[in-house]
Every structure is written in C-alpha cells, then in structure tokens.
C-alpha cells in the first residue's frame, strides 16, 4: 500500500454521513497506552545503561514528555557487540539453526506484530506524530509484509557449482557476514527497524541496532516480541542513544562486521569514514534526497495533482523520497498550481489520533524551526508563497501545508532537503531541458514522471539518475523491489532479493578430485 492508498470507497469519502459511519468500523488506538519497555535490550534481557543516564521521549503533538529511556553509550555498545559475537560464534544455537527455522522465527515475529498492530500503531503516533490510521494501514502493513517476505527467503539462499578447468570440484556458499550494526531514523521508526533486521536475520547474521533518540519506543517494544518469538539471546540487541555517542561507537567498533544506516547525507559520510578508519566494515547507506517529479501536459491532471500532493505531504513531508521538486510542463503550469493550492488548503492538520487527520506534527522543535527558516528563505529569494508558510498556533510542532510557485533551480528550497510539508512547483518547456534540470542535483534517490505517452515515460525513466523511478505513481514501495540511491543518496540496496546481497558474503570452495567427468 502506498502513501495515497488508505482505501475507502469514493462514495464514502464524498458523503459525510457515510464517512462517519465508516469511522466506526476503523481500527482504534490503544487507550491509555502503557509504556512498558524503556531499558536497553541485550541478550534478550532488559538492562539499565552502565552510566545510569536516561533521556526524555516526547510527544510531538503536545511537546510534552511521555517517558524516559535508558541512554546507551560506548560501554553498552561494547556489551551488545560481545553478546552478538557470542550468538554468532561457531556451534552456537543460531549458527546451527536450520535456515527454514530462521524463516519460521521471522514468520512468528510477523504474527506477533499483527497481534499487537493497534498498540504499535498507537506508539508510532504517540512518539512520532504520525496519524494513527496511516501508521496502522501503511507503516504496520509494511512491517508485516517485510517480515513475511524475508521469512520466505531464508531457506532459498544458495550457491552454485562452477565448471572450472582441471580435476576440481568448485562450488559457492552464501554465508552471513557476522555482527551487523544498524542505525535507523525517526521518520519511519518501526518500518526502518524491520527493513534493517529482516534481511540481516534471514541471512543468519546477528544485530546491534540503535533507534533514533526521538523515537525509540516501538523498536524497544519489538525487543519483547523478538524474545517472545523465540530468537536466541544475543541475536538482536536494541540500544537507544544519541548519534555522537552510541551511533559513533557502532560505526567505529572493531567487532562489528557491517553497518547499515538510514539518515542524512552528512552523517552518512561520517559513518563511511569511521567504517574505513576502523576495520573496513561493509557499509550500506540510505541517505537524503531532493527528488524530481515531472508532470507532462498529457498526464491525467487531477490524478497527477493528487499524487504529487501525497508525494510531498505524506508523513508530514518527512520522507527521504519526498517529490519536492515538481517540474510541470509550461502549458498546464498555472492550472496545476491552482489545483495544488486548492488541495493543500483542504489538507486536514490535527491530532494524530483524530481519524480525519491527514497531517500531524513535525518530529521536534529543531526540525520545526529548520522548516520555517527554509520557507522564509524561499520568500526572500523570490518564490511565490501560494499558501501556508507558518506554524499553527497550538501546542506541538504543527506547520501549515505550504505551496510555492515560481520556484527556480538556484533557490535553497529547490536544492536543500526540507523534510517538511513544503511543495515547490517549477515549470519546464522541453523534455531535454527537464531531464537535465532534474538530474542537476547532488542527490539521486527517486524520481517520478506522469504522462500518458509510454515512449516519453520510458525515455525519461532511463535518463533519470535515481535508484527508483515511478511512472504515473508515487511512493509505490514494496518489500519485493530493491531500494537505494545514486550519487549522494547512498550506496547499496535494501529490500527485495538485492537486499540479501548486502548481508551475505560469497565464499568459493574448490576441492581437488581424482578425475572430473562431465
């Protein structure tokens, strides 16, 4: 399911009475949610940090503290790595486990997530500000599908025999890398947790994972489910903490064999440097984006407007895939802007627990201030502010859906990743022009093109310098397809069969035999 597909019949959306009736059938948040898990998870045990320090976890819809969580630092990372290395040692329960049993454990974990789906969605809303229904239908559905997808792969990873010259028998093995350090962001806490651990565990690795300090609660809850599912101690270790301490310790740890990170390009560079300075651990990076969304005049205009709207504003604009550079062909530019503004003005901003809410708060005050500063830069540099542009006068970190027109390529809002509910609409005249401009970016995560001409669509898709290109759709992500960036949007791929390659080593084994026969 994509960001624009919280399925509800059209007649229900159009009829207020039918809408209210349908809301009675929708899933509900867990009332009076109890936060049970606030400690570090090592060796299937809940532990206090060695330092005894804790840090606050807040609700971005109110700005109020929800709880305190134990703060891991280097000493705790050392303990977790030791546990993970022991779990990965030759002869351990995990190393001797049948691949099919690893798959069964992942499937069991998916069952437990399905059982606790409403609780986990409530946690994502409380801690991350996501509208509950979006968390339930999009994030949690993605989590369950990812776990089941990799559960099915576990006993299907295999090598091959190779017909080499001479009297030799040669075959390959796909072996787990070892201990994998993983650092995940705050915009999709539970989904990114699953994107990281599922392929790693499928291949037989062990994991030390650090959730973002803003949103550790759902990852910690998953620790309880991982233990309940039956994963052996030390296979998954979850350590909440800060990037400069816990994150840096993971990136530079000599006992970690591979690191995977999702976050900013700036931090990604630091992680790659630390990996190189330590033990040349393997690195997968999924970093920032400033993605082009190209709308040709022959596209279905209403559909393109809605897809472009969802492509920017989904998840409060806090998406690395956000289609924030919308290039619109000149002949339909004014009409596209008009309809986009009308749609943005209809967007409902409110409590994440209100079922009619489309947009919740930004994650924290720092991000809120950054977005407003970039909006002001757009005004100062001459873009036309069509609507929005301000924070909403209420508790929490809410920002109005904002649309800019008359944006040029040299403006900060057209070059920098805003990570907020800000839509920039640029105009173009020719295909060659828009291809060149769309590719004129340090980033290359995703791109999209809307047109009814398949030849035009395929020509643009092949020209885009991006890891994913969507044609007549946006944010159509799934567990089966590889995802990753070109240029400064990262390296390596997550998801799909390609994601398994990032968590395994290929070993060649050659045996001398008396005589080879074909």
UniProtKB/Swiss-Prot annotation:
Chief place where the protein resides: cytoplasm
Spans through the membrane: none
Record: active site: 286 (proton acceptor), 320 (nucleophile)
Pathway as given in its UniProt record: Cofactor metabolism; retinol metabolism
Phosphotyrosine sites (modified residues): 168
A Gene Ontology BP annotation from the UniProt entry: cellular response to retinoic acid
Compartmental location: Cytoplasm
Pfam family for this entry, one: Aldedh
Family membership: Belongs to the aldehyde dehydrogenase family.
Protein name stated in the entry: Retinal dehydrogenase 2
Species per Swiss-Prot/TrEMBL record: Rattus norvegicus
Name of the coding gene: Aldh1a2
